[in-house]
Amino acid sequence: MATAPASHAFRTEVRKMLHIITHSLYTNREIFLRELVSNASDALDKLRFIRSRGDAVVAPDLAPGIDISVDKEARILTIADTGVGMTRQELMDNLGTIARSGSEQFVADLAAAENAKDADAASIIGRFGVGFYAVFMVADRVEVTSRSYIEGEAAHTWTSDGLGEFTVEEATGDIPQRGTVIKAHLREDAAEFLEKYRIEGILRKHSQFISFPIRVDGEQVNTTPALWREPKFSITDEQYADFYKHLTFDTEAPLRTLHVSVDAPVQFTGLVFVPPHGQEVFSMGRDRWGLDLYVRRVLIQRENKDLLPEYLGFLKGIVDTEDLPLNISRETLQENVVVRKIGQTLTKQVLADLARLAADDAEAYATFWRQHGKVFKLGYSDYANREKFAPLLRFNSSHHDDAQGLTSLDDYISRAREGQKEIWYIAAPGREAARLDPRVEVFRRKGLEVLYLLEPIDEFVLETLDSYSDFSFKAVEHADGEKLAQFEDTGPARDVTPLTEDEDAAFARLIERMKALLGDAVEDVRISHRLADSPACLVQPGGASTSSMDRLLRVLHKDESVPRKVFEVNRDHPILRNLLKVFTSDASDPLVEDTTRQLFATSLMLDGYLKDPHELAAMMHRLMEKSGDWYKAVRGL
């Protein structure tokens, strides 16, 4: 005999929540379907567990699944599952109190917002999945008919309009063999959720990897398997590639696939892919990065940025865990210890996998580096993983024949000369600019390899690392030429006639003259021990930042002044030897000043500090005019 409908009042916190839901507008109302499907999936999981224990269930031959249908004329959306079902008491407990279908954090936040505006409280609810009650975002009446898996239990129907009360009565009419059927009578402003394409879109977005078939009007929607849940040995490269293409809409296979399954310190599984093509650090769309976070195969957040650091933001993929509640908010995610532990563990796994790739296939790693190295270098500030990060860096260097060559820091050290304890580098806009920089000449002569830092971030990376494997990073312009003299020349000996004692003294006076001519424009003028083929160069005073770093900082601070540097001249260069002869003959000869200023201006130009190229051009024209006159006189023209 059917029981008469019994009316019950919701608990206070549920009434508050339902009031806000039914009197507010939501921009993310689609989550109601995610919540209902997730509940159905949980019910099916519970049934599977019960059957695995050998317990008897009602309708054992009933196939597991979730069916969704619509009745547009009656404005009814139906979600049915063949899961564990509920008894009358379970309907009362599970659908009558928020403690069973919401979160403790939600209750606390709702209480704090009791005196706030509806909009403020609504934002609290909007940040949380609130389980079954989310259906009242779109429905003004809900009927839940459920039959438990337990033999002999009758089916019951729970009904509510979301206004404070609900009824429970024994079910009549169309009763499920087992499981739960939810009929949501949709409000007029929720008509979109009666459209098949809209329902399918929501399911593909949030629930496409649910392990049970989800059908809409008889057609299965979730046809893509949750590949990360499958044993690694059973998955082919083609399956991984197909899944990557499905996930990212890319047309090419990934460069690398990492299938992760971790049980401690936190449980999670995942698939992480290295895309075949990279992005520029400051390109459009670079802020769209992160892994998709799933909880028990249900999408919680796309592009979650807490699962990986930004320097691994080029990675695409999915992380799935059972250690998080389904209704966790985005704000709570950022502070959640489980998410933090997943991120720390996953970062170590990715770095270890890249290290294996670098060791096993240098060419494949070089391909990875050329595509993603610019973003990867942002990891210079990841102090916790510095020892794993630094060996993965790659740079072009003077060891290579062209700009395509790449060397690791370990490779550099393996080629270091005996007694060398520095990793030398120079920052430049291109390889040729670095190779032809006057300050590199002594390193070429001594057979000392120099890293070419061709990206603005490179210098930040090395300065932050400071050292590697007992070798300190040092810019070539900070080199002490006299200390470099300890290394023997590796090339042919230079054919240079040494200055006589008188010439040496005269050159010292020439240096003083040049210093007087340049005045406050320079910190000092001195003889260079680093130049071989160039007549002059500028170097930073001891302890100062490099030229490239100084220029960058001046741009940031809008400082257009020219820094005072040390002007070094090569007394063995023909220009300086000829200038010495002119100076010895007539210290006041205009050519001394013209040549000094010309050498200084060209050095400024090479260092990136020349403010007025017209002045340099005028000096060049004057010297060309004079040299033309001398040439005519010598040739008797």
Swiss-Prot record:
Region (A): 1-330
Residue ranges, annotated region (C): 552-637
Compartment(s): Cytoplasm
PROSITE patterns listed in its UniProt record: HSP90
UniProt keyword Cell division, yes or no: no
Name this protein carries in UniProt: Chaperone protein HtpG
Keyword field: ATP-binding, Chaperone, Cytoplasm, Nucleotide-binding, Stress response
Organism classification: Bacteria, Pseudomonadati, Thermodesulfobacteriota, Desulfovibrionia, Desulfovibrionales
Domain of life: Bacteria
Main subcellular location: cytoplasm
CC per GO annotation: cytoplasm
Pfam name, any one: HSP90
Subunit structure: Homodimer.
Nucleotide-binding is among the record's keywords: yes
A molecular function (GO) term: unfolded protein binding
Family annotation (InterPro entries): HATPase_C_sf, Heat_shock_protein_90_CS, HSP90_C, Hsp90_fam, Hsp90_N, Ribosomal_Su5_D2-typ_SF
Region B: start-end pairs: 331-551
Family assignment from sequence similarity: Belongs to the heat shock protein 90 family.
Function recorded in the entry: Molecular chaperone. Has ATPase activity.
